[in-house]
Amino acid sequence: MYKLQVVLVPPSLQATMPIQFGYGPTIAESSQLLPNRTNMAQSAGDASLQYANLRSANVSFTPSYFNQSRFRKFLLFTKPTNTLLNLSDEIIDKCEKMYPSLQEDIEILSLQDNSGCDLDPDFLVKDVFNVNNIVRVILKNEIDLDDSAPVSLYKSVKRSKLNNGSPQSVQPQQQIPSSSGVLRIAKKRPPTGTTTTTTIRSATNGSMRVSTPLARQIYPPPSSKIVSNNSDDEDEDIGERSFLPPPTQPQSPPIRISSGIDAGKKIKSSIVEEDIVSRSATVDPDKTKQQRLLSGTPIMSTMTPNRVTLTGQRVVSEHAHKNELVFSASASSSSFANGGTAAVTAQDINRKPPVTTPRITSGMLKIPEPRISEIEKELKEGPSSPASILPAKAAKIPMKKPYLENGENYESDDSSSSENQETPETEPHSKASLQRSQSSIADNNGSPVKNSPLGDAMPHNVHLAELPKASNTSITKSSNGESWGKQQEHQPPRKSSLETIVEKKSQAEPSGIVEPKRMTNFLDDNQVREKEDTNDKLLEKEILPTIPHNDQPILASSDKSNGTLKSLAGKVSSNNNASKEDGTIINGTIEDDGNDNDEVDTTVRIVPQDSDSSSFPKSDLFKMIEGDDTDLPQWFKGKNSRTSGNSKNSKPYTTVLNKDIDNSKPDPRNILPQRTPRSAAKRAAQLLAGAKKNEVPQKSTEDSSSAASTDDESESGIETDFSSDDDFKRKNMSVPNNGPKDISLHSLKGSVVPVKDSKIINKEVDEERNDKRDSQKKSAVSESSVTNSKISEQMAKSFYPNSNKKQNEATKVETKPATQASSFPVVGGSPSVATKGTTSFNEEGNRKNVKTKAKNESAQIDRQQKETTSRVADLKSANIGGEDLNKKAEGSKEPEKASANIQDANDKNNSKEKEDSKSKQVSQKKLKMTDHLKEGNVQLPKPSANDKLKDLKAKFTNSKTLVPPGIISNEKNNSSANDDDSSSSGSSTEDESSSSSSSSDEETSTSRKARRVVVNTPREPVRSSSKIEAPSPSVNKKINATPDKIPVTQLMDMSSPPSVKSKTTSNPSSILHDLPRKVRPSLSSLSDLVSRGIPDVKEKTSKSNEKSQTKAPSSSDDESSSDSDSNSSSDSVSDSSSDSKSESDSDDSGDSSDDGKSFISAKSASAALGKKKKPSGGFASLIKDFKKK
C-alpha cells in the first residue's frame, strides 16, 4: 500500500505554482510524519529525500493558512498496482467520506505529481509516486468547505463528545481518516450524522462526555481506535483550546460526574476498586488525561496532587483494570508505596487503550456517593488505604522503641553494676544529675539520653558513660578499685591527647629527663607513702603496663597544664612517684596515675587505704611548701567543693557523679566513661573522682599524696588537675585511646621530661631516686634543695608561688654550685667522652681538668671581668630572678661550703692530677678563652666553673657547699680518683648500655650543634668539653623548656640537674648503692648524668669555659643576655649541669657515652641548643644570679 498525500487544488489555486510548494508544507508534514514509510514505500529514497528537503524548505516559505481555505489535503492509501484512474475514483470516494459537508461532488480534471506534471490515468501508482507521494488533484469546481463543519464523521463525533452530544462547529480541525493518519485542517460544520458510525460514536461518546468536559479528553480512546497519533494530538489541542483549560482544572463537580463514569468503569472491573476510585474527583482529571496520554505515570502524578494517599492507590486501581482491580487495588496501593506504580502503570498503559475505550463506551456513570464514602472508609481500612502503608512506618517506630529498649537493657546491665556500686542514695542523684549531664555524656547513645528522663534509665545513663570506657579500656586494669581503673580509663583519653602532644614535643625536644628526676626528688615522702599506699601501688602497678610509655609525655603535658603544681607537686609527686614508682611505676607514671587518680581515684579509689593518712601529711607538706596549709582541709573538702564547683561546672558528670556515686560505688562512673563519648566519659570520670573525693576525704588524701604534685594547688591541687583535665579532656577528646590516665596531674612532672628512651628515663629516674634517697638520707635539706631545686625551680618560674620559687631558686643556687663543685673535681675522668674516645676520655679529662684549672686561674680574672659584663647583661635580662638566686645562692653558699670542703679534698686530689694535663692546655685554652670571652661575656661562669675546679670553692663554693652529705660522699668517691670517672663511666655505662645508641646520636648532634655555636674554638680539646657543655646547658634548657616551656625549668635542668649530676657524678654507683634499687631507676639518669657530668665537668669546665664562651657569644648573639647568661652562669652550672646532662644524655645513651662520656647526646644537644633561646629570660635570671655570686 502506498500512502499518498492527496491535495485538492481548486481552479483558483491551479495557476499559482507556489501552491505546489504551498502543498509542500502539508506534504512535508506528512513526509515528516511518516518519512520512513514514504521512503520504504518508494524505491527512489534519495529523490524522495531531496524533494522532502525542498518541500520542507518550501514549507517555511508558504503559509499553510493561505491554502487552508483554498484546498484540502488528505492521505489516501492505495495499492501500488492501481492505475491513476482507479486512484481518482478512490479520491472521490474519500472526499465524500471525509468532507460530507461538500455541497457538490468534486470533479477531477487531472492528477498531477508534485512538480505539476499531468499524469496519464493509465500510470500505475507505484511508477509515478515512488519518489513523491503527493498527488495534486486538479478540480473543476471550487471547494466549498465550511470551516466550521467537521471534516469527517470522527470529527463530528468529537464535537458531540465535547458539546455533550450536540456537535458544534466551534473549532476548525484537520481530520483525515484514522487510516490515513494525516492531519488536515478542515472547516468545521455542525456535525451531521453523515455516517452511522459517527452518530453512534457521538452518541456513545456524547453520553459519556456529558458527564464532564474533562471527559472529552477521553475521546482519545475512540481516536485511539484510529491509529494516527496526530488526530489524538489535534484532539488534545482542540479540546485544550476550547474546553480543556477549564474542564481539566474543574475537579470538584465534574470530578464527581466523571468519577461516576470512572467509578462505573471501575465498578465494571470490580466493586472493590470503588475503594481505589473512591475519590472520583481525583480520578476524573487523571482519567481523562490518562486516557488521552495513555500513560499511567502522568495519571499517577495527576492523581496524587488531588488525593495524595488515595490518588496513588486509586490511580493504580484505575490502571489495574477490572478483573485485577480487586487485588490490584491493594497490590497497587502497596506498589505505589513501594514505587511499583511504574510497573502497574506499564500494565495499565498496555491495558488502558482497550480497557479505557470500553469504559468510556460503557458509559458507566453509576457510582453512588455513599459508595464513594464507603470506598473512602475502605481506603482508610483496606490494604489500598494509606493505613496499609502506615503499618510499615509504624514498624519503623517500633524499631526505634526496641532499639531504645535494647540500649536500656544493656545499659540496665551496666546500671545494675553501677547501681550495685552506687549507694541507693546517690543513684537518685545520679539519675537526676545524669539526666542533666548525659545530654552531653550520652552523645554516643541517643537511647541513653532518651532513657535519662526515665528514673530507671539513670543507671542506664551511667552506663552511657561506660560507652567511652570501651575505647578507654586499654588503661582499665583490674585493680582493687575497678572504678579507679575505669576512671583512669576516662582520664587516659584526656591524657592521651596531652601525652601525644607531650610525646611529640618530647620527641622533637628531649625534655623528659628532669621530670622523672622530679618524681624521684621526694623519695622520703614517697617512701612513707609507699608503706601506706601499698594497696594503691598494687592497683597502680596493675595499671602501670599501660602507663609507663606515657610517663614522659604525661609529665611534660602536666607541667604545661599545672605550673604551680609542678614545683611543689613536683616535690611531693616525686615522693609519690618514688612510692608508686618503687611500687612498680617508672618515672612517676604512677604518680601521674595517682595525680589523675587524686581526682579520679579519690572518686574511683573506693578502697580506703592507709595512704590516706600519709596523704594528709603530704598534703600538709605540699601546703606548707605552697604556704597553703589552711587549704589542706579545703583540699579534702575542696575535692568535693572544688571538683563539684569548678571541674563539675565544666564537666556535666561531675555534679551527677558526686551526688550519685559513693566511694564504695565507683563502677557507675566507670560505666559512664565506657559508654559516654570520651569527653563526656572524661568529664564523668573526673567529676566522679571529684565527687568521691568530696565523699571520701581520706581517699582524696590518698590521692592527694599521689596528687601531692597538685598540692601546690592544694586548694585547687586536684581542681587544677581537673581544670587541666578539662583541658586534657578537650584536647584528648579527639585522642581518647592513648591509655595513660596520668596526664591530668602529671602536669607537675611535665617540664623536665626530655625526649629520651623510656629505658634511659627509667634509668635516670632510678638513679636519681637512688642518688636522691641517699642524698635525702644524708641531708634531706640538701637533697630537697638539689632535686627540689630542679623540679621546683623548673616549675617555680612558671608555676610555684614566690616563696616556693625563692626556695627553689635558693636550693638551685646552692645545688648548682654544689653540683659544679662536686662535678668539677670528678670531671677529670670523663670530659674527653665528648671529645672522642672512652680510653682517652679519662686521661684527656684529667689533662683537660689540669689545663682547665690553670686556664681558670689565668682566665678567672678575665672571666670575672666578663662575668661582671655578662652579669650586667644578665641583670638586664634577669635582674629579678637573678637577684633572688644570688641572694639565695649566697645564703646557701655557707652550707655548700661545708660540703664543698669535703669536695675540695677530693677535687684537690683530682685537680692535682688534672692540673698537669690542664697546664698544657691552659695556654691554648687561655687563647681560646680570650677569644671566647671576647666573643661573648656570657661565658664567665664557665671560667668560674674552671676556677671552681682550681679553687673548687673560689666563687662557687656555694654550689659545693650545698651538696648533701650523701652527694658529697659520692663526690668523694668519684673525686677520690679519676678512676671514679671510669667507675662513674662504668656506672654510667650500665645506664649507657641501654641508651648507647641515643648517646652516640646525641653526641654527634651535640657536637654538631656545638660546632654550629662555637665558631672560634678549636674542636679537639674544646669540642669535647665546651661543645658538650654549651649544648648541654642548652639541652637542659631545651629539655626543661619543652615540657614546662618555662625558662626556669630549663635553668633548673641546667642548674639543679647539674648539681645533682655533679654531686652524684662523683659516686653515682655509690648513690645507687646507697639508695634502694627502686630509687635508682628514677635516679639512674641523674646518676648517669652525675657520673659522667663530674668527670666531664672538669675537662669541660676549662674547655667549655673557652668553648662555651665561644659558643655563648654565638648563641648569646641570639640571646645576648639570657643565653649568654644561661651559658656563662650556667657554664659553671652547665659545666656540671650541662656536662652532667651531656653525661646524662650519654648515660642515657649509655655505652656510646662510655666511649665518649663528655659528649652530649644529639638529642640533648639539639634540645639544649634549641631550648636555650626559648627560656632565655628565666635562664638568664638564674645564670645572672650565679654570675653575680
Swiss-Prot record:
UniProt-annotated location(s): Nucleus, Nucleolus
Q: Which GO terms describe its biological process?
A: cell division; negative regulation of exit from mitosis; nucleolus organization; positive regulation of protein localization to nucleolus; protein localization to nucleolus; rDNA heterochromatin formation
Composition-biased stretches, type Basic and acidic residues, lie in 368-381, 526-543, 659-668, 692-702, 756-777, 806-815, 884-897, 905-919, 945-954, 1095-1109
Keyword annotations for this protein, in alphabetical order, are:
Cell cycle, Cell division, Mitosis, Nucleus, Phosphoprotein
An annotated GO cellular component of this protein is: nucleolus
The reply to whether Cell division figures as a keyword in the UniProt entry is yes
> What Pfam family is a match for this entry?
Cytokin_check_N
One annotated GO molecular function is: protein phosphatase inhibitor activity
Pro residues bias (residue ranges): 244-253
Ranges of Polar residues composition bias in the record: 200-210, 432-450, 470-486, 641-657, 778-792, 1023-1039
Which stretches are tagged as biased composition: Low complexity? 166-180, 391-407, 682-691, 822-833, 969-999, 1055-1070, 1123-1137, 1158-1169
Q: Does Metal-binding show up as a keyword for this record?
A: no
Residue span of region Disordered: 160-260, 345-1189
Post-translation changes: Phosphorylated by CDC5.
Query: Where does the record place the modification Phosphothreonine?
Result: 676, 1042
Question: This protein's superkingdom?
Answer: Eukaryota
The UniProt function text for this chain reads: Has a role in chromosome maintenance and is involved in mitotic exit. Inhibits the action of CDC14 by sequestering it in the nucleolus. Also binds to RNA polymerase I and stimulates rRNA synthesis. Influences RDNA chromatin by tethering SIR2 to rDNA in the nucleolus.
Q: What is this protein called?
A: Nucleolar protein NET1
Question: Which organism does this sequence originate in?
Answer: Saccharomyces cerevisiae (strain ATCC 204508 / S288c)
Q: What is the lineage of its organism?
A: Eukaryota, Fungi, Dikarya, Ascomycota, Saccharomycotina
